[in-house]
Design a protein with these regions (language model features):
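Nucleotide-activated sugar donor-binding and catalytic core shared by glycosyltransferases
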Residues: 1-25, 31, 37-154
Length: 154
């Protein structure tokens, strides 16, 4: 999970709501905590109450891809992570009222959740993704196509 947007991390109530939802998930939550998020968690003294959520230092891009690919589900407010989860076939719950990547919402591969404990839990526990998925971002073979084009001189 990632939570870093100011609208989700600048008020104690929202951070507390998100963390309490995480604590009720069936699977453990790994939370690479952005400095702003970490500061708020410390300010509201929540970390000592976390049993299901492990706060870790921010991680690199490749590590995040690894975690995303191997996650049961991703919960995030990140714009980019929604798209990466879609490409990696990992269901995503986005903690926002809207998304730049509206195509990821098709087939429930990504769903939007309000900053409300019940809504977050409902979306995490009850969203079923469609078996069908559009290849909006390609088939992952762009590098192969580029190399073939360069080699062929076309």
């Amino acid at each position: 999970s990632t939570v870093h947007r100011a609208e989700n991390t600048d008020t104690p109530e929202k951070v507390r709501t998100i963390l309490r939802a995480f604590e009720k998930f069936d699977a453990p939550v790994i939370l690479p905590a952005h400095p702003r998020t970490r500061k708020m968690i410390e300010q509201i003294n929540e970390e000592e109450h976390l049993k299901n959520t492990v706060c870790v230092e921010p991680i690199g891009y490749l590590e995040m891809l690894y975690f995303t690919k191997n996650a049961v589900k991703v919960v995030t407010d990140s714009g980019g992570l929604q798209k990466e989860a879609y490409i990696l076939d990992t269901p995503c719950v986005t903690l926002r009222e809207q998304t730049e990547w509206v195509e990821t919402l098709n087939g429930n591969h990504n769903v939007l959740a309000h900053i409300d404990e019940d809504d977050i839990l409902d979306k995490v526990n009850n969203t079923v993704i469609s078996e069908e998925k559009e290849n909006y971002y390609g088939a992952g073979d762009a590098a192969d196509k580029l190399v073939k084009t360069i080699i062929s001189g076309e």
